[in-house]
Amino acid sequence: MADEKKKVKKKKTKEEGGTSETASEAASEAATPAPAATPAPAASATGSKRASGGSRGSRKSKRAGSSVFSVFSQKQIAEFKEAFQLMDADKDGIIGKNDLRAAFDSVGKIANDKELDAMLGEASGPINFTQLLTLFANRMATSGANDEDEVVIAAFKTFDNDGLIDGDKFREMLMNFGDKFTMKEVDDAYDQMVIDDKNQIDTAALIEMLTGKGEEEEEEAA
């Protein structure tokens, strides 16, 4: 009987020991911090794709700008740059409706809001210098202009509808914008222009004088 009691006591002691060890292990596990969750690879891939897409968009935009500049010669780009600076009346690097209106006013033309909106609507965004070159390039492609003189003529006629330019406005523009002319230089230039009794300059004759085409034709005829 005494032996049986001893066995029971030993059994209980073992069970209590086992329970104690189990509780200790559980407490240890609870005290150990859980490992940080690993980010899902799918989310990372999506972010990478977005970043890659943005980079591609940026490269595409740069390529588009570069291709426009390759259409024109350095001389043409310099001329367009000067024209852009003349048109950018508020000097913010962007040509808006008020800038276009001022450009038309400077050559004696009146453009209504509908016409100005139509011109601005041709651009895919704000008209900065690159966008202006793009518009001119598209206009040149449509008109079939290919050499330097034809590009200059087509660009000049963009702001001319009836073949005449107001002499006073043109004089003011020459003396106040771009490479500013002195009064004597303007007077000398006007002496060579075809100007009617209403002080209107013949655009075609002016273009011939600027490009030298009239002189070339006279030499060929001789």
Swiss-Prot record:
SMART domains: EFh (SM00054). GO terms for molecular function: calcium ion binding; myosin heavy chain binding. The keyword Phosphoprotein applies. This chain binds calcium. This is Myosin regulatory light chain 2. Myosin is a hexamer of 2 heavy chains and 4 light chains. Ca(2+) binds at D88, D90, D92, D99. PANTHER family: MYOSIN REGULATORY LIGHT CHAIN 2 (PTHR23049). It comes from Drosophila melanogaster. The keyword Phosphoprotein applies. GO terms for cellular component: cytoplasm; myofibril; myosin II complex. Residues 19-53 have a biased composition (Low complexity). The modification N-acetylalanine is found at A2. The modification Phosphoserine is found at S66, S67.
